[in-house]
C-alpha cells in the first residue's frame, strides 16, 4: 500500500456531484496550523505530498440552498495554474468540501478547461457557514499535491453537533450500515480503518468499484486542519470488508466518511474517532 503524507495549511478565510449531510457529507498565504494528508494506494510508502493554496475564483454571493458554480485553479511548482493533470482513481481532480463542524461532506470531480486550467464544479451548499475545500491532484510525472482554501457561505448556519467517538460500533449510513473499527489509532502512526458493510444486518455481496477502488475514505480533524484521503487495501478478508490505512498526524477528534458503491449509487458511512 502506498501512503503519501504531507503537511497541509488551511488558507486564510475568504468570503462539487455528490453531497452528504450527516445523519445516516488571488493566491493567499497559508496561515498557521500544519495538517496532514495521507493518500493510500499501492507502492512507494512514505513519499511526501506537496502543498498548495487553492485559488477560488467564486467568492461572492454564495448562499445556502442556491446552486453555485465554483471556479478555481490549483498551482504548479512555479505558481502558475496547472493545465494538464494525471488521472488518479478515474479523475483528474478530487474536490472535497466539508463544513466547519464536520456535519456536511461532498466529494466532487470538477471539469477542467485545458486552455486556462480553470476547474469548475456545480454545488448547492445545504447550510451557511465556513467550508474547508481540499483539491487532490497530480501533474503528469509530478507528485501528489493537495491545495486548500476556506470559503464563507451566507444563509442559515446552524451549529454542528459536538463530536463524540462512536467506533468501534455498528453505524448507519445512506441506505447501508457498517461495523466500523479503527485499529492502532495513535498520533503519528498508521491505523487500520475497517468497514464491514451490511444490509439488514447481513453482509452485502454486491459492492462495486468506485473511482477505481472498492471504496474511498476521507478523514478530517475537528479543526479542519488535518486531512486524510485514503484508498483501500484490496486484499479484503471478505467481499463486504474494506480496510484502509490512514495516518493521523496529531491527537484529537477526527470525523471520517467511508464511500462505497452499490446498485450504481455511492453510499456514505460517517464515523468519529478520538486519537490519543
Regions picked out by a protein language model, each given a short descriptive name:
Residues 1-14:
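Sec-dependent bacterial lipoprotein signal peptides
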Residues 15-276:
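Intrinsically disordered, low-complexity terminal tails/loops enriched in metal-binding residues
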Amino acid at each position: 500500500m502506498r501512503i503519501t503524507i504531507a503537511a497541509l495549511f488551511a488558507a486564510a478565510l475568504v468570503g462539487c456531484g455528490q453531497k452528504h449531510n450527516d445523519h445516516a457529507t488571488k493566491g493567499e498565504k497559508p496561515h498557521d496550523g500544519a495538517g496532514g494528508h495521507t493518500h493510500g494506494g499501492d507502492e512507494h510508502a512514505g513519499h511526501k505530498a506537496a502543498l498548495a493554496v487553492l485559488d477560488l475564483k467564486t467568492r461572492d454571493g454564495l448562499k445556502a440552498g442556491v446552486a453555485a458554480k465554483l471556479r478555481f485553479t490549483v498551482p504548479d511548482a512555479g505558481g502558475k495554474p496547472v493545465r494538464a493533470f494525471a488521472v488518479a482513481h478515474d479523475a483528474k481532480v478530487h474536490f472535497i468540501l466539508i463544513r466547519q463542524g464536520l456535519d456536511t461532506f461532498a466529494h466532487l470531480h470538477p471539469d477542467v478547461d485545458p486552455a486556462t486550467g480553470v476547474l469548475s464544479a456545480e454545488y448547492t451548499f445545504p447550510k451557511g457557514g465556513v467550508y474547508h475545500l481540499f483539491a487532490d491532484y497530480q501533474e503528469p510525472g509530478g507528485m501528489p499535491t493537495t491545495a486548500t482554501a476556506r470559503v464563507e457561505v451566507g444563509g442559515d448556519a446552524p451549529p454542528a453537533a459536538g463530536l463524540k467517538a462512536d467506533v468501534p460500533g455498528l453505524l448507519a449510513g445512506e441506505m447501508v450500515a457498517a461495523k466500523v473499527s479503527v485499529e492502532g489509532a495513535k498520533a503519528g502512526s498508521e491505523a487500520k480503518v475497517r468497514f464491514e458493510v451490511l444490509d439488514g444486518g447481513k453482509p452485502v455481496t454486491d459492492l462495486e468499484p468506485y473511482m477505481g477502488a472498492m471504496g474511498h475514505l476521507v478523514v478530517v480533524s475537528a479543526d479542519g486542519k488535518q486531512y486524510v484521503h485514503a484508498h483501500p487495501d484490496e486484499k479484503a478478508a471478505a467481499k463486504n470488508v474494506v480496510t484502509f490505512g490512514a495516518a493521523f498526524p496529531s491527537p484529537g477528534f477526527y470525523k471520517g466518511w467511508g464511500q462505497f458503491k452499490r446498485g450504481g449509487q455511492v453510499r456514505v458511512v460517517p464515523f468519529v474517532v478520538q486519537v490519543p
